[in-house]
Design a protein with these regions (language model features):
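Intrinsic-disorder/low-complexity, polar/charged segments enriched in Ser/Thr/Lys/Arg/Asp/Glu/Gln
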Residues: 8-10, 134-136, 185
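A short beta-strand-loop-beta hairpin characteristic of the jelly-roll/cupin
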Residues: 140-160
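Short beta-strand His + acidic residue motifs that chelate non-heme Fe in jelly-roll/DSBH
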Residues: 127-130, 147-149, 158, 167-179
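A short hydrophobic beta-strand segment most commonly corresponding to one strand
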Residues: 137-140, 164-166, 180-196
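Non-heme Fe(II)/2-oxoglutarate
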Residues: 1-103
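A short glycine-rich, His/Asp/Glu-containing loop-to-beta-strand
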Residues: 102-123
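Short, conserved beta-strand element in jelly-roll/cupin
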Residues: 120, 131-147
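Residues that flank catalytic or metal-binding motifs in active/ligand-binding sites
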Residues: 114, 133-135, 182
């Protein structure tokens, strides 16, 4: 059997991994991970918001809409709130002096972005099997060999080396961290990237 990795597209951009990790350490000194109340397996620090609207990054808006098969009925169900991704164009003032602002500026010049977030996957945890409305751009910041993303039953480890990936999150997928340290990725919604 030959595995097809076409849903994991490495981009022709690379950032300085040491600067990414430094920026992450700077941000967690001033901001904790947020998520919807009662959801223990999700944490986000939003780097962008709807201009002038700090409430646009709180609660379920940190996560956004997705579809899942939650039980044995096999019926797909929608979860969380629909997000107007294109409205999330303002880089949050508190983080403008970090390397993430440079990363945002470079990415924004190449892609039409929605929300840009730092996402946490805690040790020995996983997401649900779900699909999203659009592809995602990933820049792994901290990872370990036990971290994998699975798209349509194909698993891939994305190394923390400054590489930029676009993943086809419109297909069913999940991410898991089988290691014993946090997995940290910069994740952006990409509104103008099409997979075949």
């Amino acid at each position: 059997m030959t595995l097809n990795f076409e849903d994991f597209q490495k981009q022709d951009i690379r950032f300085d991994i040491n600067e990414l990790q430094k920026a992450y350490r700077e941000i967690i000194k001033i901001k904790n991970f947020d998520g919807p109340e009662g959801i223990s397996n999700f944490g986000a620090i939003s780097l962008t918001q709807i201009p002038g609207n700090p409430d646009s990054i709180k609660g379920h808006k940190a996560r956004g809409v997705f579809w899942t098969y939650p039980d044995s009925s096999g019926k797909e169900q929608i979860r969380d709130e629909k997000i107007n991704e294109a409205a999330y164009s303002e880089f949050i003032e508190d983080y403008k002096n970090t390397y993430f602002k440079e990363v945002f500026d470079v990415l924004s010049s190449k892609y039409k972005l929605g929300r840009v977030r730092i996402l946490l996957k805690q040790p020995r945890s996983t997401l649900s099997w779900h699909r999203d409305p659009e592809p995602r751009l990933h820049i792994p910041i901290i990872t370990n060999p036990g971290c994998h993303m699975v798209i349509d039953n194909v698993a891939k480890h994305l190394p923390a080396d400054g590489s930029v990936w676009i993943t086809n999150n419109t297909k069913y997928h999940n991410a898991f961290n089988g290691g014993e340290e946090n997995r940290i990725h910069l994740v952006a919604c990409v509104l103008d990237h099409k997979f075949n």
